């Protein structure tokens, strides 16, 4: 190194001797973008235009560079390293000085300086917390300045900034690079009950019951609630002077007996970390009273009956008081704590409305029960005992009834089918028969009117004179070629065949019976394909 070095600021030259202190040199090099350390004799081929042009020309010509991390981060109180490496080129250049600077709002503040001849200097604000990592640099006269990484310890929020590592070289000039340092503040999280005593009063009002707070965090935390309790949450952020943020959230509910002993969980998320805290609500409320012991079956002479006053309260009930509406309590009772014992058998005098009042420090509530006394026990039907023999006899009777019902149904069906089959044709089995409408005739032909008996037999219960009646006159029918005997077998038949159209005339003029309008075939008749029927005897022949 030459005895004299020249610091150029703009187009002006400043000379400083080599024996000057580091602090004096540091003051000269505070504006790194404008001041360069170069020899008085310029290298051949370099033309000075301005400081930036010189820097670019040296970079292009020699290829020196400074390597740093793009960014670094740490929490308050932690230790972090800011790397700075100098990559020399060919031919190599000579490192005259290394300077670390802090850039805040466009202003540069020197942090540490390493000079091969003058040693290492750390400025006062960082003196106890910043040091060079490489042992060769920490020597009184640094032997190597190619690795000038610094170590930040006990980080503070004020350390957050951009830091510049600048190398002053000969004859290449200055090389620099920058690293951004971010400082995080881990918040302090806690959850508390809003009030040590939460009271459910009348009228009911909403109130905050728990508070979750994440204080002095950077960046701010996110708070959520996890609970089955119905309510709503409020959130508030406060920015502190040091750059941290305090987040506060209250959970608001309507205090009641149902909210007592409910669990509230606060979930705080800070970056990738998660914190949880829980509280159990302690809600004080008036007693909830219910009287038990009356089962609706207090009958005369029933022994050992009692009434119990059960109260759900927080804090617990301290006083129980019994009374009977519209009267005084019977003489045969004994009160122990919350129970009313009735001595002796039940009588009608025990009936009435019993009231129990329960009192705690929050208030007094009451419950009542209406006691009715009956003469006989009220035994539910499903609880009555049925003898075993009744069970067996009932099963037998049920089986018998079921069997009889099935038998009757079978007989009815059999009778029905038999009666239908008994409706047969009452003629003889002589010749082939044809069906005409609803009546029958022989194959020889159909007369104008079927032969009718001259006398009809009246039923025995008829009111008219029971004697044969002559059918004659203009309204009568011709007897044809055949004479009928009043005592013949044909007249004793209950029906005879007529044409359907003529049957109406018979109904109007005679006492003849009406018949089924549908043709019926006897069991000894066989139906033919042409619509006729013949007797089985003729069919087999």
UniProtKB/Swiss-Prot annotation:
Ranges for domain Ig-like C2-type: 187-282, 287-374
Bilayer topology annotation: Single-pass type I membrane protein
Main location class: membrane
GO biological process terms held by the UniProt record: heterophilic cell-cell adhesion via plasma membrane cell adhesion molecules; homophilic cell adhesion via plasma membrane adhesion molecules; protein localization to cell junction
Coiled coil: none
PANTHER family: NECTIN-1 (PTHR23277:SF69), NECTIN-RELATED (PTHR23277)
Listed name of the protein: Nectin 1b
Species assigned in the record: Danio rerio
High-level lineage: Eukaryota, Metazoa, Chordata, Craniata, Vertebrata
Gene from which the chain derives: nectin1b
